[in-house]
Amino acid sequence: MSFAIAVSPHGHSQKSTSSVMRLTLLALVPGIAAQCYLFGWGVLFQLGLAILTALVSEAVILRMRNYVVSASLKDSSALLTAALIAVAIPPLLPWWMVVLATAFAIIIAKQLYGGLGQNPFNPAMVGYVLLLVSFPAPMTNWMAPQAVTAQLLSPAETAAVIFQGKTSEGLTNYQLKTLVDGSTMATPLDHLKTESKRGHSVDTLVTSANFTAVSHEGWRWINLSFLAGGILLFMLRLIPWQTPVAMLGTLAAASALAHYLAPAQFAMPEIELLSGATMLGAFFIITDPVTSSTTSRGRLVFGALVGGLVFIIRHFGGYPDGVAFSVLLCNILVPLIDKYSQSRVYGH
């Protein structure tokens, strides 16, 4: 019997880059569906705009670099970046903002560094932070869930708000936001941060009917949907367990300790874990294999740092949610984390 001689590695993974990206996009579907149910057609419009912008931007830059455009676009990495930006922004954001964020993410945060696998920062978070820093008011202008709002927007009305700034009846994005009980709607984290600064107790705020039914309940379902997608990624062995577990564990521990010491100022862990972009960040952002740590111990450190920074920024910073800033700050530390978390080589 003859045996073939081949060089290592002898074990090969059947998962290509494109298949990993497409499976990750599939895992995003529950979260996207939850957002569509709660916020309406705007989510799909933003998704379409982001995808179109990502593909065009990537194709133009690849052509300028004399790369084969069709082959590079097939890896679906641009689609994933676009999807992450689309689910992170308010559904009725003006069209040019999502175009700006996506183009910046693809051209500056990804291709300028050399393309897929070369970027030190998560492109989707770079694009998101660009909008958050440049246009903070529109980026915090979230709609109330459709189940409680007085204005259910059709696809045509949604398109009118996104592309023209107002509905056929003349209602602007801000006016649509204030149709629920005559008060402006906010994400749970934004609501708690604003009202606690006015002297209201967090314990009282989280038990109010408005917070439970209108604000937190919807975001809880969104986070649970992204959690379901994250579990799918675990089952498919596409992401390591260390990074999300470390992030969520650190955030839960910090919020539990803070709530125990000062319940009037800090919300319970359940609020922290199921509000904002917590689950999206834990399973789809910080698990990016390019911009996160590559060692087992390093992933624990990286995730713990992100979780700790999220808690600090949420409660002591100027923004209600700190996932994007935390991820980008920790991206800077990845080379240092990897250097000091390498396992000792046998024999040395």
Swiss-Prot record:
UniProt EC number: 7.-.-.-
Top-level taxon of origin: Bacteria
Any GO BP annotation: transmembrane transport
Gene Ontology cellular component list: plasma membrane
Keyword Ribonucleoprotein set for record: no
Membrane topology, from the record: Multi-pass membrane protein
TM regions (residue ranges): 20-39, 67-87, 124-144, 221-241, 244-264, 266-286, 300-320
Disulfide bond entries: none
Keywords carried by this UniProt record: Cell inner membrane, Cell membrane, Electron transport, Flavoprotein, FMN, Membrane, Phosphoprotein, Translocase, Transmembrane, Transmembrane helix, Transport
Annotated positions of the FMN phosphoryl threonine modification: T187
Cofactor(s) recorded in Swiss-Prot or TrEMBL: FMN
Subcellular location: Cell inner membrane
Family according to the record: Belongs to the NqrB/RnfD family.
Subunit details: The complex is composed of six subunits: RnfA, RnfB, RnfC, RnfD, RnfE and RnfG.
Function: Part of a membrane-bound complex that couples electron transfer with translocation of ions across the membrane.
UniProt protein name: Ion-translocating oxidoreductase complex subunit D
Organism encoding this protein: Tolumonas auensis (strain DSM 9187 / NBRC 110442 / TA 4)
Gene that this polypeptide is encoded by: rnfD
